């Protein structure tokens, strides 16, 4: 059986605000019967982008259906602003590959560098021929310059047809990390509320570029956050029940005490749980809040729901008196509102 040549023309990478979208194939010259032209449209979802924040490095593995490497592409693409609604940036690349008796292709995309240790000065160096190792690659959190500088990955499969020479392939690359914001307020303008300490607990020491694994080698640590001091902002009304209304009062009625990237942690269900003491063997993220209200000391531990990759979670905390608090959890993707969780008391 003769070799078939597949020509990959014009990988179009789209930085979007609202997930995948359909893009018409780029018009190309009609290929010969021994060529296949594949157009790759890679959708990269983002939220909270400042308009200039673009991924810095692209790595793309093109494999057969058994994950044998056909071609590897690595570059630092030049991004161009897009006039298309819902699209921020566009870049393109070209490559040609030869195949023989291949029925399908697998694509693995990694954007930006990842590090295997916080002490590393060089990013992870991939064995480009070992796809199994690629899919099991773990990484640690480092300092990122923006939402689109974090590690992002995407996969796709393409079934080849006997007489088809041109394909559209859309790869949705998503961030491999979560993001968490914590906000505090009080319910009485006459009260004096001071945060003594905030601890974020059960932080996984590593995450995975692709699928999250059940990994007994993950260690969970706790970190004391930098914020401490008086909370002067007040919110006395009932908590809103939607994201838009919360955003309207967030800046005026709540003090932001934390806002940063986190590793994915799939322990936990859909509920927030408020307790006075840590729960043994519970590996959910938790917030330990130590505070003084009108001279009385207290502390609460708030166990969070699952912290999934590419999701932005906001925890709103209102301290009513020395022993009772209200909480509200808002979970959204960086691209659109995915889920609203009602207030838990």
Model-found features: residue ranges?
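Short, polar/proline-rich extracytoplasmic segments that appear immediately after membrane translocation
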Residues: 24-31, 304-345
